Design a protein with these regions (language model features):
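Acidic/His-rich, divalent-metal-binding segments that scaffold phosphate/diphosphate chemistry
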Residues: 2-70
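Electropositive phosphate-/nucleotide-binding environments in soluble metabolic enzymes
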Residues: 10-14, 30-34, 72, 109, ...
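Divalent metal-dependent catalytic cores for phosphoryl transfer on phosphate-bearing substrates
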Residues: 49-155
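A generic alpha-helix surface/boundary motif
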Residues: 14, 34-38, 75-77, 126, ...
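A structured, mid-to-C-terminal "fold-capping" secondary-structure block
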Residues: 138-139, 145-199
């Protein structure tokens, strides 16, 4: 079986970050982009795509590029903004696919796209839970505690449980496995994200 070519971005990481900042000023949105970038980089290495870590990371970093300025056209304005910034069609497809079934009809096919689809909403849930905990950190967080928050529909109500469940199904993972891996990814990157956010 012929090996698929490695996915690479024509952008450097600095260029991708500048592109995000061009359209996003809200510290919350910037933190979310940096968090999802770090989580995607962790998953790339964890799942055997280490040679594509930069690509996975940039897709995570830029996945909500249009949300701050165009919330009603989320994932619909992104292709234009990304194309103007020099992004490849492959990167654009990866970014847009995370909105499948909610704001676009671009389905996530590659494992990277499925991870983004699953982890995007889940990072928000984990972050909300972390803010409640001692030290406002994911450090020491356990799956059992996150499960309770997941079942409480009033907690972080903006984080779609249905999307998280569908994401796990698309990956062929148990929900518990997705929780465990994403918690570990956020724990591993928390310090770097905090520093990038000036904390």
């Amino acid at each position: 079986m012929e090996k698929k070519p490695t996915m690479k971005s024509p952008l450097t990481r600095d260029q991708a970050l500048e592109l995000l900042k061009k359209y996003n000023k809200d510290p919350f949105h910037l933190r979310h982009g940096l968090t999802v970038e770090a989580v995607m980089r962790w998953f790339a290495k964890e799942l055997g795509y280490g040679d594509e870590e930069e690509f996975w990371g940039q897709v995570g970093l830029l996945h909500d590029i249009d949300f701050e300025l165009y919330p009603d056209e989320h994932c619909q304005k992104a292709p234009e903004l990304l194309k103007d910034g020099g992004a490849s069609d492959e990167l654009i497809h990866g970014v847009v696919s995370h909105g499948y079934g909610q704001c676009c009809d671009v389905e996530p096919f590659h494992e990277m796209e499925k991870v983004l689809f699953a982890a995007d909403e889940l990072t928000g849930l984990i972050w909300s839970y972390a803010l409640m905990r001692e030290g406002k950190s994911a450090e020491g967080m356990e799956v059992s505690g996150l499960k309770k928050k997941f079942k409480d529909k009033k907690f972080a109500a903006g984080c779609s449980r249905d999307v998280i469940k569908e994401g796990a199904e698309r990956l062929g993972w148990e929900l518990t496995d997705l929780f465990d891996k994403t918690i570990k990814a956020m724990q591993a990157s928390e310090k770097a994200v905090n520093e990038a956010c000036g904390e």
